[in-house]
């Protein structure tokens, strides 16, 4: 069998594995608030998230097109198949490490950093599509900041509207609303996160001359990635649910709805303009913004600091892992 075909098959398998892991690693963030407030039972939340992630993944492909062509040029990438496989293995390794320790790291940072690191190892810094790459990095940096500010503002407005309401009654009403916002957040998660694997597989198909257009995501790729993420979601990432849903702040239904709406708005906005963002950090930052508006001292800033450190180090670490994986695979293939 042709070595290029073997590499492409391995890439498809690893990309679907990445999406599967992304499902149980990142989807915890989308349902963490609804589980922590008991708006949904854990198993019901997981099923809801799995279905909505699948639906979201089947709805859009704009982010996939960005991943396909804006980090590196798939048509000219030197030793492209090895680069892509190395990036996937590096991102999967980092995701599993952070999942094991219950750290809400970003699959987006991991795969984007790993692709950049592997491409630089293969062909130097000239391999990067700087215009597209910088645009992606800007989105990754700005989106959690915007989420924090928007979460703070939205919850401040909610507090003002319900300042004279009975707290217990208000939370009971918001608990019902939170089922809807959890579904919405899971849907938007699927519209952005599942597309990263779609873009990677399409990039690999172009590199192997099995596909021609970076602006056309094959239907089978979209369906396979949506299914992988849905299945991964069905397993659930309980360690990360505990961190996002309880260790940042004590979340009440009114807090959860505000955070869910903020996160969903930012993620869907990014999807609409075809930009990949870290759903992990957007959702976590939304909760931090809501928490700061509710009561600054009520936020566990130690957990927030640990998440911030992970946010900062994921790109360089995944880039380094991508480069190391490339050098190893290049000796094999």
From Swiss-Prot:
InterPro entries recorded: Phos_transporter
Task: Enumerate the UniProt keywords alphabetically.
Answer: Cell membrane, Membrane, Phosphate transport, Symport, Transmembrane, Transmembrane helix, Transport
Per the record, membrane topology reads: Multi-pass membrane protein
Q: Which reaction does it catalyse?
A: phosphate(in) + H(+)(in) = phosphate(out) + H(+)(out)
Q: Say yes or no: keyword Flavoprotein present.
A: no
Alphabetical GO biological process terms: phosphate ion transmembrane transport
Location comes to: Cell membrane
Q: Which Pfam families match?
A: PHO4 (PF01384)
Q: Name one GO cellular component term.
A: plasma membrane
The protein's GO terms of the molecular function aspect are:
phosphate transmembrane transporter activity; symporter activity
Record field: transmembrane: 1-21, 44-64, 83-103, 110-130, 136-156, 217-237, 263-283, 308-328
According to its UniProt entry, the function of this protein is described as:
Low-affinity inorganic phosphate transporter.
PANTHER family registered for this protein in UniProt: PHOSPHATE TRANSPORTER (PTHR11101:SF80)
Assigned protein family: Belongs to the inorganic phosphate transporter (PiT) (TC 2.A.20) family. Pit subfamily.
Q: What is this protein called?
A: Probable low-affinity inorganic phosphate transporter
Instruction: Name the species this protein comes from.
Output: Bacillus subtilis (strain 168)
